[in-house]
Amino acid sequence: SLDPVTIHADLSEWIIKVTGETNAIISEFDRPSGSGMSSETLLFESTWGEAENEVHKKLVARLAPTDQDIPVFPNYNLSSQVKVMKLVEQLTDIKVPKVLWEEASIDVLGVPFFVMEQVQGRVPPDIPPYVFGGWLFDATPESQLRLQELCVGIIAQLHQIKQKSPDTDFLEFHTKGDTALVRHFANQKEYYRWVVQGGRQHPVIEQAFDWLESHWPEES
């Protein structure tokens, strides 16, 4: 919903400011299709510095949604995304894009945003959902299994992060519950209630909630 010409001009000026290089330039934007639908994602390249000190990077700008965009979450917290990515980079060897800059104000582009380095790879699409079609749907069973195992491995690494400090307090859900699992479950139910507040129900999801509550693990 943002004007790409205006964004390019404003981001060009901002890059000069954050790099401290008056010759910093950025390329035209490439907008990924089929994924990243919760907010605007812009792919571009930037160059700054001179001669042997020249820096060239492939970058991604992630913009918070505007007030005119259809909300996907009750509250869109861009800062939490940045904090999570930085924690994962610091505490694991998971390949996560390095966040270079964060702009919390709306003075530059009209919405908060951050800029990170690109990580090369293939992203399963949201449109259509990858379970209905696309490169992952068409992949061989062996390739699908490999992606599944890699995803489970990444999730396992994330759960091995034991560090508890004021830097991780933002990860706690504010829902009631004696354990992290109970609070997570309560948070998901709250999100579901927000999604269906217009009157559209999802019986399968509600049945799943009921099943989980009646089969709750003794250790959670």
Regions found by a protein language model. Give the residues of each.
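Juxta-kinase regulatory segment immediately upstream of eukaryotic protein kinase catalytic domains
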Residues: 1-27
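ATP-binding pocket architecture of kinase catalytic cores
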Residues: 28-207, 211, 215-218
